[in-house]
Amino acid sequence: MATNIAINGMGRIGRMVLRIALNNKNLNVKAINASYPPETIAHLLNYDTTHGVYDKKVEPIESGIKVNGHEIKLLSDRNPENLPWNEMDIDVVIEATGKFNHGDKAVAHINAGAKKVLLTGPSKGGDVQMIVKGVNDNQLDIDTYDIFSNASCTTNCIGPVAKVLNDKFGIINGLMTTVHAITNDQKNIDNPHKDLRRARSCNESIIPTSTGAAKALKEVLPEVEGKLHGMALRVPTKNVSLVDLVVDLEQNVTVTQVNDAFKNADLSGVLDVEEAPLVSVDFNTNPHSAIIDSQSTMVMGQNKVKVIAWYDNEWGYSNRVVEVAVKIGQLIDDKAMVKAI
């Protein structure tokens, strides 16, 4: 039985999630909530500067949009509590506005009748379970939680990488740097921002800033709590990022042993290993959370290791959002079947 979903927010992640969800037979997209007219949403779904022309036909209609004959209702209400999730029988709301990334705010969707909510970003507080596929998705708990967070794109990258290294060799400590493509949190031209470096034009500079990825990692991989720290460098490219992770391991290793650990990891669809000498544009629209650049793996002093992992911070992340939504829906169905027996 397909899971009924609604998407709140039609920004970069909301639109990518919609594209991917419409290709997943386990999901039934019933509604989107956005402040733009259907003509605008249809156009931005059909034509995307980063990910190309959509392979489906999206048309604006009076009630919303139609995608290859599938009608999706367009709502436009900034207050989630007013949305008709109960009457539409919505199982999972994918919260993609970035404005409700706190359990106390996201609960408005539950109050409106949705069964569960999945945030497309790290939670800023409240009763929320953070899930990273390939790290702790086997612990997804719909009995205890109504609201879930898919963490950040960077946490989805570093999570599987750190898990493999820690499980196989043991991590003593380490530092990470994410070299991250620009996002709409930055400014095209110099303008005020609470982070004075992000106030500067994103197209002109490499911009050092903070990342919560290493800190958030402890929520999904508690074994590394207090062992990793990091920062971000925002660079003037439109998409695809990388994590540069340097760790001291408990065991002595070789480059081959490190790369083999990633190749042999049971993380199909989440983590991949690339042996060709590629650059960032080659990973555009790659669905994995992390792609190890095997040619860049280094070992010094037998146990100090440097690993580079690429990730499409839009498309890879949006694939994980859809997959976690599917898993939440399956658990809802399983629970309903048990009750019916």
Swiss-Prot record:
Keyword Calcium among UniProt keywords: no
Key words, A-Z: Cytoplasm, Glycolysis, NAD, Nucleotide-binding, Oxidoreductase
Keyword Membrane appears in the UniProt entry: no
Gene Ontology CC terms, in alphabetical order: cytoplasm
Catalytic-site annotation from UniProt: C153 (nucleophile)
Site (Activates thiol group during catalysis): H180
Residues forming coiled coils: none
Pathway: Carbohydrate degradation; glycolysis; pyruvate from D-glyceraldehyde 3-phosphate: step 1/5
Compartments it resides in: Cytoplasm
GO BP: glucose metabolic process; glycolytic process
Main location: cytoplasm
Binding site for NAD(+): R12, I13, R78, T120, N184, N313
Gene Ontology terms for molecular function: glyceraldehyde-3-phosphate dehydrogenase (NAD+) (phosphorylating) activity; NAD binding; NADP binding
EC number(s) per entry: 1.2.1.12
InterPro entries: GlycerAld/Erythrose_P_DH, GlycerAld_3-P_DH_AS, GlycerAld_3-P_DH_cat, GlycerAld_3-P_DH_NAD(P)-bd, Glyceraldehyde-3-P_DH_1, NAD(P)-bd_dom_sf
PANTHER family in the cross-refs: GLYCERALDEHYDE-3-PHOSPHATE DEHYDROGENASE 2
Function statement: Catalyzes the oxidative phosphorylation of glyceraldehyde 3-phosphate (G3P) to 1,3-bisphosphoglycerate (BPG) using the cofactor NAD. The first reaction step involves the formation of a hemiacetal intermediate between G3P and a cysteine residue, and this hemiacetal intermediate is then oxidized to a thioester, with concomitant reduction of NAD to NADH. The reduced NADH is then exchanged with the second NAD, and the thioester is attacked by a nucleophilic inorganic phosphate to produce BPG.
Entry similarity comment: Belongs to the glyceraldehyde-3-phosphate dehydrogenase family.
Oligomeric and partner information: Homotetramer.
The protein's name: Glyceraldehyde-3-phosphate dehydrogenase 2
